[in-house]
């Protein structure tokens, strides 16, 4: 089991990296936190972000996914959304340590 300090460090790294990739690609969305779920033998990290410019999606997701895979097996799901005239791709991810 990992310590609380390690969990906090991982959460901060993920938020910082995701936000820097989004900012670099001129995306307006910023991730504010990563959630954790404590299981008996592991910790599950879960988060999501949005990409508004669909032309940026491949570059953004490739860079973020590469970073997330450094933590091991990552489950990544994306869905194109059209909400009140706004179009974006919602991406969720989770992994266990």
Regions found by a protein language model. Name each.
Residues 1-33:
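N-proximal, solvent-exposed amphipathic alpha-helical segments enriched in charged/polar residues
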Residues 32-36, 75-83:
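Short amphipathic beta-strand and strand-loop transition segments with alternating hydrophobic
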Residues 4-9, 50-56:
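Short, surface-exposed ligand-recognition loops at beta-strand->loop->(often short) alpha-helix junctions
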Residues 58-76:
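Short, non-transmembrane amphipathic alpha-helical segments
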Residues 79-97:
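C-terminal edge-of-domain segments
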Residues 28-55:
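Short glycine-rich, basic-tinged beta-strand/loop micro-motifs
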């Amino acid at each position: 089991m990992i310590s609380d300090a390690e969990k906090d460090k991982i959460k901060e790294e993920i938020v910082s990296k995701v936000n820097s990739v989004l900012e670099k690609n001129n995306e307006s969305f910023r991730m504010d936190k990563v959630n954790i779920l404590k299981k008996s033998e592991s910790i599950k990290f879960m988060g999501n972000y949005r990409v508004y410019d669909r032309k940026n999606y491949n570059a953004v997701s490739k860079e973020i996914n590469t970073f997330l895979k450094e933590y091991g097996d990552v489950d990544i799901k994306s869905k194109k959304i059209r909400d009140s005239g706004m179009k974006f791709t919602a991406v969720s991810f989770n992994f266990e340590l």
